[in-house]
Regions:
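Acidic, Gly/Ser/Thr-rich repeat motifs that build Ca2+-stabilized beta-propeller blades
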Residues: 23-183, 231-234, 239-247, 299-337, ...
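Bacterial N-terminal signal peptides
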Residues: 9-18
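Bacterial N-terminal signal peptides that target proteins for export
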Residues: 1-10
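Mobile, glycine-enriched helix-loop/loop "lid" segments at the mouths of ligand-binding/catalytic clefts
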Residues: 197, 255-286
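Beta-propeller fold detector
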Residues: 40-41, 80-87, 141-150, 203-211, ...
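Beta-propeller blade signature
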Residues: 129-138, 189-202, 257-258
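Conserved blade-ending motifs and adjacent loop-strand segments that build the rim/top face
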Residues: 341-362
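Blade/loop signatures of beta-propeller domains
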Residues: 23-38, 139-142, 204-214, 271-287, ...
Length: 385
């Protein structure tokens, strides 16, 4: 078993990450229920950025771009050339280079994990892949990149890759896999479509996964019945894994992921088809043997990356969950009593930008990526008296 470690604790520095003076001049203030908030550009000129990770000791950031580039962003906002050693991606539709996370032991092993759309399927179709490589000391690229997980079969013609990555307290890697817009596969246990999987950091399957040893069932599966999971985060207080996913037309969900559970898609949904017709397989908003959403939006905001806030800088945000929204172009703040959502606030709508990812930085600020041709990495914080 792994030594329990918290990556942010290992990387944390209370000092502010330095910002470009030119970009700091572009800071904008917006209202919120808890006082005004400031959004300050850290970096501009990103090509549809998808995810970010914080390097230790205030070195800067790694940012993925959908067309297939991994970039180093210095603390003052300078973008590197695309890093070498990144796998070739299938950059069509929603496919491309997707999530990035650092190893829990990054200071020792320098391993960077990437998820991406990979071609090679029958009829030119694609699926999600996950791999890892060692970040070069000069930050110029990844070395010895190896694939540790492939979604099989590959069924996507451009949609629903999922692909979020998160480590739990014990060092297991959780990966969300979309159903490739092939609804019934989310219920098929011989396929990796519409699943959350749990693996060791090197791709091996833990013996205590729920379906290990069952004939015809993929042993990597931890949960199933997911549609297109776009957010994944470790709850820092309970240690549980939380996931969010796109509904069809309506029915975006937040779920607490439990071992071996069925989360319903497409048998249960709060949404309908984009054609305005019912989902053919759906039995209603609930179905026997499935887990109801922990939180649901009847009108889809198009949720994306999410992060729990457990920093010390902004006490008013403590125990809140922040969720990016692509369609409504906002940052959603969810407030809890225990695990129950009791309040929701919409933030940053004035930016009029698709928010693809949100992460809590080691300095206690939130960092937000906008999914645009000229994407921006923002630092977001409350203005405190």
């Amino acid at each position: 078993m792994f030594v329990r470690k918290t990556l942010l604790a290992a990387l944390c520095a209370t000092a502010l990450l330095p910002l470009s003076a030119a970009y700091a001049a572009d800071s904008q203030q917006f209202p919120s229920e808890q006082g005004s908030i400031t959004a300050t550009p850290v970096a501009k000129g990103l090509d549809h950025p998808w995810a970010l990770a914080f390097l230790p000791d205030q070195q800067g950031f790694l940012v993925t771009e959908l067309p297939g580039h991994l970039r180093f962003v210095s603390p003052d906002g300078k973008l590197s050339a695309p890093l070498k050693g990144v796998p070739q991606v299938w950059a069509k539709g929603q496919g491309g280079l997707l999530d990035v996370v650092l190893s829990p032991d990054f200071k020792q092993d320098r391993l960077v994990y990437l998820s991406y759309a990979e071609g090679g399927g029958e009829g030119g179709k694609a699926g999600t892949a996950v791999g890892r490589g060692r970040l070069a000391a000069d930050l110029s690229g990844l070395e010895d990149f190896k694939v540790i997980l492939r979604q099989e079969p590959k069924l996507s013609t451009g949609n629903h890759f999922g692909s979020r990555l998160a480590f739990d307290r014990d060092g297991y890697l959780f990966v969300t896999l979309g159903e490739n817009n092939d609804r019934p596969t989310a219920q098929d246990l011989d396929k990796l479509q519409g699943k959350v999987v749990r693996i060791y950091p090197d791709g091996r399957v833990p013996d205590d996964n729920p379906f290990v040893g069952q004939p015809g069932v993929r042993p990597e599966i931890w949960s199933y019945g997911q549609r297109n999971p776009q957010g994944l985060a470790l709850n820092p207080w309970s240690g549980t894994i939380w996931e969010n996913e796109h509904g069809p037309r309506g029915g975006d969900e937040v779920n607490i992921i439990e071992r071996g559970k069925n989360y319903g898609w497409p048998l249960a949904t709060h949404g309908i088809n984009y054609s305005l017709l019912p989902i053919p397989e759906a039995k209603g908003k609930t179905a026997e043997g499935t887990v109801a959403p922990h939180h649901v939006w009847e009108k889809s905001p198009g949720i994306s990356g999410m992060a729990f806030y457990d920093g010390d800088r902004f006490n008013a945000w403590q125990h809140n969950l922040f969720v990016g929204a692509l369609v409504s172009q906002e940052l959603i703040r969810l407030q809890f009593e225990g695990d129950k959502v009791v309040h929701e606030e919409r933030l940053l709508g004035e930016l009029k930008a698709r928010i693809r990812d949100v992460r809590q930085g080691p300095d206690g600020f939130l960092y937000v990526l906008t999914d645009e041709d000229d994407g921006v990495l923002y630092r977001v914080g409350l203005n405190q008296d």
